[in-house]
Amino acid sequence: MQIFVKTLTGKTITLEVESSDTIDNVKAKIQDKEGIPPDQQRLIFAGKQLEDGRTLADYNIQKESTLHLVLRLRGGAKKRKKKTYTKPKKIKHKHKKVKLAVLQFYKIDGSGKVQRLRKECPNATCGAGTFMASHFDRHYCGKCGLTYVYQKEGVEA
């Protein structure tokens, strides 16, 4: 039977083969006509690459079928050098867990009453439990930006 092989250049080759012929035999016939070594040939039929050991009948290739010939690509990505670090890696900070850390925000006076040491932010967007940072001249909320500035005695505004 006769089959067609279409190359990348658009040229069509006709080959005389049998359905019992292997893909190796077809590649050898293409080498005779075109001079392309079989190890560089890739034959494609119906969107599938044809494997060397199988026959034309395995792929249901009938008379006047067209195979597409493409060349095998050699090589791959460029080899990269392994990165060498001049400085040692920075050691990450480890979080120190302190048991009952919330006790530092409260004080119990002589009568047994609990008193807050830090000012809680009154803004509704912050919610309960958001304390304001205590600076030398002001209280500041880091979440919403609310600031209370202390009035200095003897200075009129």
From Swiss-Prot:
SMART domains: Ribosomal_S27 (SM01402), UBQ (SM00213)
A single GO BP: translation
Zinc finger feature spans (C4-type): 121-144
Keyword tags: Cytoplasm, Isopeptide bond, Metal-binding, Nucleus, Ribonucleoprotein, Ribosomal protein, Zinc, Zinc-finger
GO molecular function: mRNA binding; structural constituent of ribosome; zinc ion binding
Protein name (database record): Ubiquitin-ribosomal protein eS31x fusion protein
PROSITE patterns named among the record's database cross-references: UBIQUITIN_1 (PS00299), UBIQUITIN_2 (PS50053)
Organism annotation: Arabidopsis thaliana
One GO CC term on file: nucleus
Note from the entry: Ubiquitin is encoded by 16 different genes. Ubiquitin is generally synthesized as a polyubiquitin precursor with tandem head to tail repeats. Often, there are one to three additional amino acids after the last repeat, removed in the mature protein. Alternatively, ubiquitin extension protein is synthesized as a single copy of ubiquitin fused to a ribosomal protein (either eL40 or eS31) or to a ubiquitin-related protein (either RUB1 or RUB2). Following translation, extension protein is cleaved from ubiquitin.
Similarity section: In the N-terminal section; belongs to the ubiquitin family.
InterPro entries assigned: Ribosomal_eS31, Ribosomal_eS31_euk-type_sf, Ribosomal_zn-bd, Ubiquitin-like_dom, Ubiquitin-like_domsf, Ubiquitin_CS, Ubiquitin_dom, Ubiquitin_ubiquitin-like
Record-listed cross-link Glycyl lysine isopeptide (Gly-Lys) (interchain with K-? in acceptor proteins), residues: G76
Gene name of this polypeptide: RPS27AC
